[in-house]
Amino acid sequence: KYKESQDERFGIIEEAMTEYPADGFELQLNHMPYFFHPNEIGEGRSIMTDWIGRVHEVVKRNGKDKELAIRLPDRIEDCMNAGLDPETWVKQGIVDVFIPEMFNENARVKISADYSEYTNLVRGTDSRVLGTVNSSIQTDRLSEAPISMIRASAMNACDQGVDGLYVSEWFQLWPY
């Protein structure tokens, strides 16, 4: 099911991994994560898992040190409801790096982000978790967070045992 769409997206990834020097590949699955009709979510998880497996295979074919990183909703329940199954991906060893972000709100600072679902999920495996460090707060007074808020967000992630930090959605702060 949905073979044509899968193959089209996979072809782009395969070209990027085989024709260009790359350290790996990152999938952004958190922006509008609506991949399947609500009646097809269960079947969709299996479809997406098979596709993620194909992507992982092409990434590793270009070097065992190459990694597949996936940005996805920060709650596993939200992933499951979108047709994404990180629990199975960890069991199958097909995702190297998980980057949990607030569901559909990945640009906003989330000082109280909870990474425990993912750090517990990957414990004892080869998969890793990166905490996201964002800059946007979009209030009526401020667009971007002050440095103290950004540092608090980073320290919260580190205190929870993430394996590293991922600077996400800093478009307006060039040169960062």
Annotate each predicted stretch with a short phrase.
Residues 1-176:
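Glycan-processing catalytic domains of CAZymes
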